[in-house]
From Swiss-Prot:
GN (gene name): rpsG
One of the record's GO cellular component terms: small ribosomal subunit
NCBIfam families reported for this sequence: rpsG_bact (TIGR01029)
Name the record gives this protein: Small ribosomal subunit protein uS7
Species: Magnetococcus marinus (strain ATCC BAA-1437 / JCM 17883 / MC-1)
Gene3D superfamilies reported for this sequence: Ribosomal protein S7 domain
UniProt keyword RNA-binding present: yes
GO molecular function: rRNA binding; structural constituent of ribosome; tRNA binding
Biological process per Gene Ontology, one example term: translation
Keywords assigned: Ribonucleoprotein, Ribosomal protein, RNA-binding, rRNA-binding, tRNA-binding
Family: Belongs to the universal ribosomal protein uS7 family.
Length: 156
């Protein structure tokens, strides 16, 4: 355990177009090698595509997608008497959001569409409709926690 003082969490500055902290956080996670302007171009381009395809407010689709993907339970490894148990634990709110963002970006990157903005738009639309790879990941995480419910008494 570190003896240094705890580093304070930095406040995320809301993005310019939508004035939303969740959007800014998503763009920061989307950013690679510090290229924020590229991340913004990809993200806002994806929002334009979402608006064209769904004829809905893209911020609404985005928030719905993030809400749908948020996991409530996950498993953590716990070593007890030489055996590793997968112990189901509730996910803290900040981690829920972080996991949702990470999964959305990860599965968008692994899609087959040509450009990243198309991939991101498609993944966000699917997640907002309750389908797609990201939703499957959330369901698998919940299923894993459900299957290991017998080890819940090892929670710490």
């Amino acid at each position: 355990m570190s003896r240094r003082r705890e580093v304070p969490k930095r406040e995320v500055i809301p993005d310019a177009r939508y004035n939303d902290k969740l959007v800014a956080k998503f763009m920061n996670c989307l950013m690679v090698d510090g290229k924020k302007s590229l991340a913004e171009r990809v993200f806002y381009g994806a929002f334009d595509l979402i608006e064209q395809r769904t004829k809905e407010d893209p911020i609404k689709v985005f928030k719905e997608a993030v809400d749908n993907v948020r996991p409530t339970l996950e498993v953590r490894s716990r070593r007890v008497g030489g055996a590793n148990y997968q112990v189901p634990v509730e996910v803290r709110p900040v981690r829920r959001q972080t996991l949702a963002i990470r999964w959305l970006i990860g599965y968008a990157r692994s899609r087959g569409e040509k450009t990243m903005r198309e991939r991101l738009a498609a993944e966000l639309i699917e997640a907002s409709q309750g389908r797609g790879a990201t939703i499957k990941k959330r369901d698998d995480t919940h299923r894993m926690a459900e299957a290991n419910k017998v080890f819940a008494h090892y929670r710490w």
